[in-house]
Amino acid sequence: MDPAGPDNDERFTYDYYRLRVVGLIVAAVL
């Protein structure tokens, strides 16, 4: 995995957004 990849930031943003969505769903259920 190359941290200097052109899509590194995009992938990180997608993962972070997905994590936030999962967190919101869990918070709503709890």
Swiss-Prot record:
Belongs to the FXYD family. It comes from Squalus acanthias (Spiny dogfish). GO terms for cellular component: chloride channel complex; endoplasmic reticulum membrane. It is found in: Microsome membrane; Endoplasmic reticulum membrane. This is Phospholemman-like protein. The lineage of its organism: Eukaryota, Metazoa, Chordata, Craniata, Vertebrata. Induces a hyperpolarization-activated chloride current when expressed in Xenopus oocytes. May have a functional role in muscle contraction. It holds the Pfam family ATP1G1_PLM_MAT8. One of its GO terms (molecular function) is chloride channel activity. Keywords: Chloride, Chloride channel, Endoplasmic reticulum, Ion channel, Ion transport, Membrane, Microsome, Phosphoprotein, Transmembrane, Transport. The keyword Transport applies. Phosphorylated by protein kinase a (PK-A) and protein kinase C (PK-C). Phosphorylated in response to insulin and adrenergic stimulation. CDD domains: FXYD3-like. GO terms for biological process: regulation of monoatomic ion transport. It is a single-pass type I membrane protein.
